Structure formats: structure tokens, C-alpha cells
Amino acid sequence: MSLIPSIFGGRRTNVFDPFSLDVFDPFEGFLTPSGLANAPAMDVAAFTNAKVDWRETPEAHVFKADLPGLRKEEVKVEVEDGNILQISGERSNENEEKNDKWHRVERSSGKFTRRFRLPENAKMEEIKASMENGVLSVTVPKVPEKKPEVKSIDISG
């Protein structure tokens, strides 16, 4: 599978997947007076739709989520219904000083939840998570594949 960086948003996409969601939208921002008028809404959407990479190695499923500005106490990693990995978090606004004169407020607050159905080969009881520099890493070890038992048969004659 060939992965290339997208020139329309910096995300990665599979160039051979006709159903890839990473497509250029020529009408994005069309109904707003200015393309910049939609920027704060896009920032909120970027937070509420936290970007998560999921890769599979021979030993584990590894999830990496970009959560800039969040502390590990503001993030939850849970398993629901036995095989649904849920990553959620909440960013709150700082206390505003009513007497201050604000020139610009761009940082957003909000909640996000991302859910992933884990495959049958995931070891749910051994999931580990860590967070460093705003990047959450979740490692889900895999059950080793059972190799078929091969028995050699002597050929007589």
C-alpha cells in the first residue's frame, strides 16, 4: 500500500483507495463571506475531531493521537463492550478576567471522543497508554498467531 502526504490538508491518504475521505473540497468556505471567517470553527472542529493514527505491527496495534494542550488528566482511554477502544477528552476555557480588554480569543474549548473497534486478535487486558508532548500513545498487544502444526509423513516404498 502506498501512502503519500496530501497537498490538501497535510493528512496521509491511500492513493489507490477510491473511497478515501481525504479529498479536496473546492466548495469549502464557499458560503462564508471570507475563507478566514470559518477559521475559528475549523479550529474547534480540529479539536473535537482529534486526529488519530492506527498502525499494526507484528506484535501490536498502536494508536497515536495528537492532543496539543491537554494534560493526561484531561484524557480518558477506555474499552467498552469488550472490544471498542474509546479515547476521549475535554479542554476547558481558562478563567476570563472581566476587567481585561481582550483583542483576540482563538483557543477553543470542547470535548472529543474517538472510538475504534479492535480486532479479535487484540489482548484487551494488556492495553497500555502514555502521553508525552501532547501525543497520546496507546499500545494494544496482539495474540500471537497460531502456526499450523506440520507433521512429516514418511513415504514407504
UniProtKB/Swiss-Prot annotation:
This is 17.6 kDa class I heat shock protein 3. Its main location: cytoplasm. SUPFAM superfamilies: HSP20-like chaperones. It comes from the Eukaryota. Gene3D superfamilies: 2.60.40.790. Belongs to the small heat shock protein (HSP20) family. GO terms for cellular component: cytoplasm. CDD domains: ACD_ScHsp26_like. Residues 43-157 form the sHSP domain. It comes from Arabidopsis thaliana. It is found in: Cytoplasm. The gene is HSP17.6C. The keyword Cytoplasm applies. Keywords: Cytoplasm, Stress response. May form oligomeric structures.
